[in-house]
Amino acid sequence: MPVPTTNVGLSDIAAEFGGTVPHALSEYYNNGSAPASGTIRFSHLAGESAGISLKAYGKVIDTNTNSTSYSGSLSASVAVGDVIVIAKVTGFGDFAQGTTTINSISGTVLSFDNEWFSPIYGMMLFEKVTATASASSISVSCSEGSSNRQGMYVFAWLIGGGATHDDTAASASTGTLTVDTGENGAIVVGGSYTDDSYAIPDLNGADFETTFNRDMHVWAGHTVQSGTAATSSMTVATTGSDNRIWSFIKA
């Protein structure tokens, strides 16, 4: 909309950015953080209705059970257009990706890494889908073919607000991802799969981890950036580790 010279109201902002009543400035401003004083800029109007948000995250599957198929769910309010990202890790079995559906959708594989440390072998896979229907949970189903897996771990992130994949970094030892977030913010997610159970990576202080099948160690984490350019880095052990970090921004 053209910016008026006087008397800008929340109704004008709502007409530009959408949203639901009752309206509040924090609904739109800088990912929900309106200042108590000082200058308010239209370039900062990128909150819940105009920017992206991390709506939910957590473990969907975490088991050492031998099987060729696994399933699990995470309670979450999924809306049409939300992006669901998963980190999927297997133990033993074989190096194949298997078949994974997320809320009954076959997703896009972002990365696929094999891991081997005698006698352990498996893989780590990142995948994403865009929700085509609303749901009350994130449901993941994994079909692993004829070779038994001796364990499965899946971690999921739900990103709302019309996100798109922006960039990636991957390394056997260190991954560093730089994102120019502009005014819309960014969400960076990552995961690591290593035989060194003492090497817990860190992604800007947001850590979740579990010990997985015979000393294999799985880690998943995220950080939410807001308003300024930022660098997110993840460091893991150099021995037998796979790691990935991904950023998502407003489409």
PLM regions: where:
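Primarily extracytoplasmic/secreted proteins
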Residues: G51-A251
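N-terminal low-complexity, intrinsically disordered "leader/linker" segments enriched in small/polar
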Residues: P2-S53
